[in-house]
Amino acid sequence: MNELNTVSTNSSDSTKDGGTSNSPDDMDSAAAASHAIKKRTKASRACDQCRKKKIKCDYKDEKGVCSNCQRNGDRCSFDRVPLKRGPSKGYTRSTSHPRTNEIQDHNNSRSYNTFDNSNNTLNNNTGNSGDNGINSNTVPSTPSRSNSVLLPPLTQYIPQAGGIPPSFQNPAIQSTMPAGNIGQQQFWKVPYHEFQHQRKGSIDSLQSDISVRTLNPNEQLSYNTVQQSPITNKHTNDSGNANGSVTGSGSASGSGGYWSFIRTSGLLAPTDDHNGEQTRRSSSIPSLLRNTSNSLLLGGQPQLPPPQQQSQPQAHQQKLQQGQNLYSYSQFSQQQPYNPSISSFGQFAANGFHSRQGSVASEAMSPSAPAMFTSTSTNPVNVAQQTQRPQGQQVPQFSSELDGNKRRQSAPVSVTLSTDRLNGNENNNGEINNNNGSNNSGSSKDTSQHSQESVTTPVALEASSPGSTPQRSTKKRRKSYVSKKTKPKRDSSISITSKDSAHPMTTSSTIAYGQISDVDLIDTYYEFIHVGFPIIPLNKTTLTSDLLLVNTQPISNIHEVNSYVILWFRNSLELLVRVALKQKPGGKFFDNIVGVALSPSNDNNKAGFTTATARDDAEKTRRDSHNEVQDTLEVQSVFIAALNECFQKIVDIHPKFRENNDQISPKIKVIYLSTFILLNYILAFVGYDNSFVLGMSVTIFNEFKLYKLLLFPEPDINDVKPPVDEEVSTGNGNTKTSEFEIGSESAGHMNPSNSPNSMDENISHYSVLFKRLYVLLSVFDSLQSCAFGGPKLLNISIQGSTERFFSNDLGSKWCLEQSQLRLKSVLQSLKLGELMSELTRNRISMNGNRKPGFDITNSSSLLSEYVETQPLSVAQLFCKLLIGKHNFINCLLSLYDSEAGVYSDLTLDLSSKIADSLCSLISIILQVLTLILRLNPTNSIDFNYRPPNPPANNPTVQEGPSAMGSSPVAGNLSAAPPSEGNPDFYKKLLGLKQDTGTILSDLCRGIISPFAIAILHEVYNITELVKQMPTSLISIMMTATTTQNTQDTKKSQDLVMKLSNSMNEVVQITSVLTMIKPFKIFEHELNKPIMSLTGGLSSTTRNDVMWPKSGQGLRESSVMKTLLDERRTSGTQPTTAPVAAEEPRLENVALENFVSIGWKLLDDSELGWY
């Protein structure tokens, strides 16, 4: 008793001195301070920078900075919380600190009284609830700590609504919580066996135990509050694991086996009974109760969120509603804060496809079933997500060990990004709403005796909010309950493997997906990408309300395929958006890259993961220690690894499509094939040559027999009179035999009754989508052939397919775009692809012995219908440029007669013809560049530079070009805030006029295009070849003026004036080319020489032909000229060779240069633009 009085006296003294704590440690420090009144002159510990570098710190108060920080220009900070010191060896609590033990017992008794009172109150609430089920707050009293098995932590059952602690729970909120499901058990069933090698609880460690510790208001533990689907719970099959292993169910898939495409229906929301279910032993819960039939969506209708959402703070509600639109997105829905672990793409994030999943029966009956409380996931995707947390929140102070099989079930999270974050600005204030609750939950008692290799999360990131005490987990504390800690291996593909897994883990995700929410992805795509080129050939309403309504319930053997396909479609779309986002200077398209060591001396990231603070410090170190070339190579390697990962994952599932072709829904097939279009779009967008992706895509499309839909007659969607929801069937209930089943070997039909996942849908309603997808792949095939000069892989003509398959009725369910104005821009980009397809199919080098210009003339006449009087988009202007280029090539090559070996006479009419073609070509080039400069010079997604929203389905805009410039459109454009200080000034500077074409072209403002880099390369090539021609023609005109009459002199003067204007335009083109930077990831040098890979030609031929510098190589023989000469000499007419070898006359030197330029332009068309 005297000792207790002494303690009280010391405590009061320490309080007077400014102390705020009555803990024994503070008492000892206060007693020691009384004996040593002398103030310290040196820091009692090293500053954070010196401790990080593990060097001696000489910090003093009078200087305020240590010598090391002063030398590096840093400031000394002591923000890091000191770690608790562990006991020394041979330490005995009973003999060493008897007084401290008594105080600890006293505090523990007070804690027990607090928990007993709270438990009694909760038990009374349970008795009042009656048959309504177990409330999530009804927690059994703390068991005897000596020989009992620890139940899941108490914080697991406490609702985490905005981080409200148990003591601040509002009784009114609890009264509004829905009752539990009928038939659930009301009482706990304690596990009948103990887990061996599990640390027993003790009274002394009670307050440090997370399972009985109260929550701080500023601390929110992200526990998984949703019951894990049994399909996503994999079990270990090791025979030696007799007692089972305590593992977590940290998957982010839906609780009812459905994707979170449902807008958090009441049954899928984490109600109180789901919280109670989460903590029960799976062996004591029947499978029907753990996955009730009520979780099925009846009709796929979205339901209201749970009433608990009303209890959230007002500020938190506003943040959640910023990016949340009222869409009936089936899977691409914004996750509610109560349901973070219902993320729609979590099951197959980085673990590949597994045909074997845990069955419902085996999980309910297995005595070694895992505990149903969650633990920390070790998936690098989730670990990277843990680094971003809102202010006022802290991560748990523990890291749980996982079994190898459970680690494969971790999932990416869905994080709603603010506008600044999406623009590439680092969000240092923590404005990101982290909607994942399954990543950081777990139990500090989670161990496994059979774990051979285990990975823990990095040291927790301290919170930066004012008023909260930052805390960190200690390595020594973790070692006390972690069986074995091993640093994971990092290989070239950045993977983490588990030796104890029943199935080896596949390569981990290269970048952390889930940083952009599902709703934001779809909105961003249709706002910035779809108008430039339709990757998903469907309007937004049908995509979100019909196509993405995919059932992943375990009612068939293809639910894994559905989940897997949609996951990697979503990840590929996020990869495109993140690459296309406008980045800040020095920023990267990836933020949470996993597994890359940021600094050789960085010891804080031993597991290979990065945190937000570590990234900030390491970014500065990287800029100081790495040059620009190394940073570029790093970004390129990460991008290639991420692209290859998405491509490999989506290809791996193809055998399952072949096996279950009759059962897979057409919706999944459309999404699956759209993923290949998406990956080819990414390659074209960054200008990267990867023919393997295109070749495999063509193979997959041919496996689905999509070419039959284009080759064989079938009624178009415009000709289908019945509604789309009706089935056009024959008498036996099957579809028409004239329609081909996608993926079958021949024409056939589908029986809806044999396809439980097809939702009784007739595949004929999706045939137009498959046709569109095939046309889109053919466009990318043509683009790659034009850009890199390779042969075309798809030789089926798509001429006229734009009008047949894409420009259907706007009121149709399957229309491409619901706005007529936006649809016109989409169709123009498709016509550009159609034109490139026809040009590559009719190449001279690919079509035997044909005269140069024969196919060019035919193509120009056939495709002239694409050119309108007022071009509205870059794609349409580029179509006009390509046709003008081929006409110009034909005009130049006609100056020389290869049969007779003579040049034509350069008359005034011929000179006028050449000048008109040249001036027209240069004028179109300037229009293309100025329009690109005004609309999107960087070809990036900038949320501060959004495209205007035209009125949807306005009948006044469908009549003609004059009606399109009506007042509604002009009013909408004028209402949009201008991003430039004076738009009219810049338009006048660029030579643009305020006419109908200019107004309509603004609809493409901010839109990205896959043709941007290819267009810039081609424009540069043409400009470099023809920029000296106006000067040559002017010289010829001035020379010929002396021998002409008055009328011809007036005509020649007009030509000279026109050519002078063209020279001025060439200067403008040269300056504008330096202002357009559409390059992403890979830097393209427009004037970089490319070595010829043609076997029979010299390596220097291609250099001078394609990129002549300062007039070099104007007389060099072109590749196509050499090829055609060889074909002509190998024929049966060798008599023309001596005539062609005659020395040209001096007066024909200019004509010879013009013909040489024509051949080089032909080389550019035949051998590629890059």
UniProtKB/Swiss-Prot annotation:
Quote the CDD domains the UniProt record gives: GAL4 (cd00067)
Q: Kindly give the Pfam families that the UniProt entry links to this protein.
A: Zn_clus
Polar residues composition bias: which ranges?
Answer: 1-22, 139-149, 411-422, 445-457, 493-506
List the biased-composition ranges (Basic residues).
Answer: 473-488
Question: What are the GO MF terms of this UniProt record?
Answer: DNA binding; DNA-binding transcription factor activity, RNA polymerase II-specific; zinc ion binding
Main location class: nucleus
How is it modified post-translationally? Glucose-induced phosphorylation regulates the DNA-binding activity. Hyperphosphorylation in cells growing on high levels of glucose does prevents DNA-binding and dephosphorylation restores DNA-binding ability.
Q: Where is the composition biased (Low complexity)?
A: 113-138, 239-250, 293-302, 309-323, 385-397, 424-444
Compartmental location: Nucleus; Cytoplasm
UniProt keyword list: Activator, Cytoplasm, DNA-binding, Metal-binding, Nucleus, Phosphoprotein, Repressor, Transcription, Transcription regulation, Zinc
Q: Which residues carry this modification: Phosphoserine?
A: 202, 205, 208, 229, 283-284, 410, 414, 1130
The Basic and acidic residues compositionally biased stretches are 99-108, 271-280
GO cellular component terms given for this protein: cytoplasm; nucleus
**Record region (Disordered):** 1-47, 77-149, 226-254, 269-288, 293-323, 384-506, 944-977
Q: Which residues bind DNA?
A: 47-76
So what family is this one in?
Belongs to the EDS1/RGT1 family.
What PANTHER family does the annotation carry? GLUCOSE TRANSPORT TRANSCRIPTION REGULATOR RGT1-RELATED, GLUCOSE TRANSPORT TRANSCRIPTION REGULATOR RGT1-RELATED-RELATED
Functional note: Glucose-responsive transcription factor that regulates expression of several glucose transporter (HXT) genes in response to glucose. In the absence of glucose, it functions as a transcriptional repressor, whereas high concentrations of glucose cause it to function as a transcriptional activator. In cells growing on low levels of glucose, has a neutral role, neither repressing nor activating transcription. Binds the consensus binding site sequence 5'-CGGANNA-3', of which multiple copies are present in all HXT promoters regulated by RGT1.
Q: What name has this protein been given in UniProt?
A: Glucose transport transcription regulator RGT1
Say which species the protein is native to. Saccharomyces cerevisiae (strain JAY291) (Baker's yeast)
